[in-house]
């Protein structure tokens, strides 16, 4: 039997936009002996709530739990408002401020006329209020409307819970649709999936079928089509799918046979409702099609803005060269000039070609030619990158502030929306985005919407690296469209032409490996190793790494030579068990003080982002369990609620490493990795190494990866749209 407590809500301790609440509750009654000590005292409670009114009476159902830090708390599973029954309580309730225009004297008059069942009487027969002298029609409407709204909302939330939605999901649904919730539920329950990011198709589908919906209901097929297109495009990076593909995925998702007529009818309805767009047998989610179209149109607009002319341009660039004590090659000079004269510029190049040097020069040129102070420069220019580590790296290189695109757009993790958007644009005049190959279509569309139409853009990246995790391949499409201002940096910058690491990167990209590369060199060491001895060889090299700066980059987590196994082994080399180091086991994995870990998701409130690497400084493993991680001077506290947001980082995935650089990199290469061996992946891994690179494993695996350049070719239409929108510029 669930425990229940009846009492008064006293105050909020914490309240999130998602409806999660921590608060104080004064207990008056309980059905649980363990809670008797709290009668006439307050207890801390947690749970998801629609709305709570201070000093109102509620009935909470749930359980008494022991929090590792804060002691006994009541975890609320469901709740209901208790309408006051006593005369004084009813007067207090009606005059609480919840009912606008109803003061204490008016409340006393109402209760005096209607008696102890005042609230029930108002709900069931509001016309009785007309019998009370001095009560206005406006007050009657307020009383009836407010009581009805509150009663309806609670009944709706409870009914959603009875169907199988969690309290959190029920609140998300009600907060989205309010009084229309029941209508939407009856008309098309699948709109809950379509409209609310946190609610999954599978959850809604399970509840719909359980509630008696026919397996071939057109509303179900429509939702499955939207789910299929979204999931597959996110997985493979496509902008669109073909009809036959969608049909196959939908049948797999629904686990039912549907006729081609039923499928076609659903497609037609989705087109009519503008939820999908069909162009020449290509089927897009409307949001994706509009994102590509917006990007192409904005690029076209920027290309049409007249060039900026300045007689001081050449002399100012010469001044910039003097400032940095360097001379730029012709490609670099071209990029620097175009960054000023043009309103959109793409700069691409491989490792060692001076992309970061160009960004520094562009910023300095903009400052000097516009006669800006450092403070004014930072107000007018925004240096952005897709990841926290990449933004930190560009900030260190330029001595200017930089941040992630999400941070710049003021991403709200509660509703997954940006505060900087088409309705509230940023005031910056110039935006430079580094590591642009990692930016997906939706994110770039959001960035453009958050900028003024005349904001200058410089986009910098290496399009031979891995594309974005999300859909699209924007940098590649922009370059291959031949429609934009593009500068390709080819000449190796300064002394880096002597780097064997960079030579290997270019050989990989050209699919022409020189056998001499397998001879051991100072900065590049290939160690042929049988598959069963790769991890042992990694440990051997790690024991010689006295500086503890080596970073292992691997393609996948599982298998004998996967990231998880390598991390387990390397922990004992770099951070062995010690009586002086406290430990904590999380999901079967031991974490100890001084462990190197990687952040797996964004925590913008803590200024820590996906891919950031830190060191565990403190662990508390007593009645309270906490882990403190230092990210380059920013110490973040983790509790059990977010322990899943980090992993060991002695070995990390190549995808997670993108946007970062390491002095020493070790890449295990075994045929065991299968489909994860492909050119762009290995090229990206190799280009993470600054000073030293180890390749450990099978030569045949390296050769297989280099020859495999056809993995997951992405289907997009941005290239064609750019050509169409810019053809007459």
Give, region by region, the residue ranges found by the protein language model.
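Accessory, non-ATPase domains that flank or precede helicase/AAA+ motor cores in DNA-metabolism machines
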Residues: 1-311
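N-terminal pre-P-loop "Q-motif" helix
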Residues: 325-341
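P-loop (Walker A) phosphate-binding loop of NTP-binding proteins
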Residues: 339, 350, 386
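Conserved helicase motor core of SF1/SF2 NTP-dependent helicases
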Residues: 346, 357, 361, 365, ...
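Hydrophobic anchor at the beta1->P-loop junction of P-loop NTPases
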Residues: 347, 383
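Conserved helicase motor core of P-loop NTPases
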Residues: 355, 374, 463-606, 617
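Post-Walker A helix-loop "phosphate-sensing" segment adjacent to the P-loop in P-loop NTPases
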Residues: 365-380
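C-terminal accessory regions
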Residues: 612-729
């Amino acid at each position: 039997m669930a425990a229940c407590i009846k009492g008064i809500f006293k105050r909020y301790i914490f309240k999130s936009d998602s409806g999660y609440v921590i608060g104080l509750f004064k207990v008056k009654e309980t059905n649980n002996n363990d809670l008797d000590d709290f009668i006439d005292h307050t207890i801390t409670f947690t749970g998801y709530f629609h709305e709570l009114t201070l000093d109102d009476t509620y009935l909470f159902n749930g359980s008494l739990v022991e929090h590792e830090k804060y002691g006994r708390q009541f975890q609320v599973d469901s709740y209901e408002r208790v309408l006051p029954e006593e005369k004084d309580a009813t007067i207090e309730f009606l005059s609480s401020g919840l009912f606008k225009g109803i003061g204490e004297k008016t409340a006393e008059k109402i209760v005096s006329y209607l008696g102890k069942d005042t609230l029930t009487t108002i709900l069931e027969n509001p016309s009785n209020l007309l019998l009370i002298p001095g009560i206005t029609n406006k007050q009657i409407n307020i009383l009836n409307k407010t009581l009805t709204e509150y009663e309806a909302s609670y009944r709706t939330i409870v009914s959603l819970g009875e169907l199988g939605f969690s309290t959190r999901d029920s609140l998300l649904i009600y907060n989205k649709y309010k009084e229309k919730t029941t209508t939407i539920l009856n008309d098309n329950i699948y709109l809950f999936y379509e409209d609310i990011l946190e609610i999954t198709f599978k959850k809604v589908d399970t509840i719909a079928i359980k509630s008696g919906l026919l397996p071939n209901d057109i509303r179900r097929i429509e939702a499955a089509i939207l789910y299929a297109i979204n999931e597959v495009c996110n997985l493979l990076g496509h902008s669109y799918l073909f009809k036959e593909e969608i049909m196959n995925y939908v049948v797999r998702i629904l686990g039912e046979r549907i006729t081609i007529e039923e499928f076609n009818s659903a497609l037609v309805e989705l087109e009519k409702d503008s939820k999908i767009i069909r162009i020449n047998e290509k089927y897009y989610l409307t949001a994706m099609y509009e994102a590509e179209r917006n990007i192409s149109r904005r690029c076209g607009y920027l290309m049409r803005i007249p060039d900026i002319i300045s007689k001081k341009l050449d002399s100012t660039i010469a001044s910039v060269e003097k400032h940095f004590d360097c001379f730029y090659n012709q490609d670099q000079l071209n990029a620097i000039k175009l960054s000023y004269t043009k309103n959109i510029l793409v700069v691409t190049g491989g490792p060692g070609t001076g992309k970061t040097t160009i960004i520094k020069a562009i910023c300095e040129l903009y400052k000097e030619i516009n006669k800006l102070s450092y403070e004014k420069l930072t107000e007018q220019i925004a240096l952005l990158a897709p990841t926290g580590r990449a933004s930190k790296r560009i900030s260190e290189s330029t001595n200017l502030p930089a941040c992630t695109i999400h941070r710049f757009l003021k991403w709200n993790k509660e509703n997954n929306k940006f505060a900087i958007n088409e309705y509230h644009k940023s005031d910056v005049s110039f935006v430079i985005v580094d590591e642009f190959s990692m930016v997906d279509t939706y994110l770039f569309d959001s960035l453009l919407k958050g900028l003024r139409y005349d904001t200058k853009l410089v986009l910098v990246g290496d399009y031979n690296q891995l594309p974005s995790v999300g859909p699209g391949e924007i940098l590649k499409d922009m370059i291959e469209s031949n429609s934009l201002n593009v500068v390709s940096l080819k000449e190796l910058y300064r002394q880096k032409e002597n780097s064997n690491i960079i030579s290997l990167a270019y050989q990989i990209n050209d699919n022409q490996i020189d056998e001499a590369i397998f001879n051991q060199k100072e900065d590049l060491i290939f160690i042929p190793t049988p598959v069963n001895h790769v991890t042992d060889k990694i440990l051997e090299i790690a024991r010689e790494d006295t500086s503890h700066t080596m970073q292992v980059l691997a393609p996948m987590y599982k298998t004998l030579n996967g990231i998880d196994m390598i991390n387990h082994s390397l922990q004992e080399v770099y951070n062995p068990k010690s009586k002086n180091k406290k430990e904590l086991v999380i999901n079967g994995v031991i974490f100890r003080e001084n462990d190197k870990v990687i952040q797996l998701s964004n925590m913008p409130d803590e200024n820590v982002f996906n891919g950031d690497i830190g060191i565990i400084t403190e662990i508390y493993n007593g009645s309270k369990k906490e882990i403190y991680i230092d990210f380059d001077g920013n110490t973040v506290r983790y509790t059990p609620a977010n322990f899943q947001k980090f992993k060991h980082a002695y070995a990390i995935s190549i995808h997670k490493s993108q946007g970062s650089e390491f002095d020493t990199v070790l890449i295990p290469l075994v045929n065991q990795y299968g489909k994860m061996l492909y050119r762009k992946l290995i090229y990206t891994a190799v280009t993470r190494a600054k000073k030293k690179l180890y390749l450990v494993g099978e030569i045949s695996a390296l050769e297989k990866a280099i020859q495999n350049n056809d993995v997951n070719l992405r289907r997009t239409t941005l290239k064609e749209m750019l050509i169409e929108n810019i053809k007459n510029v």
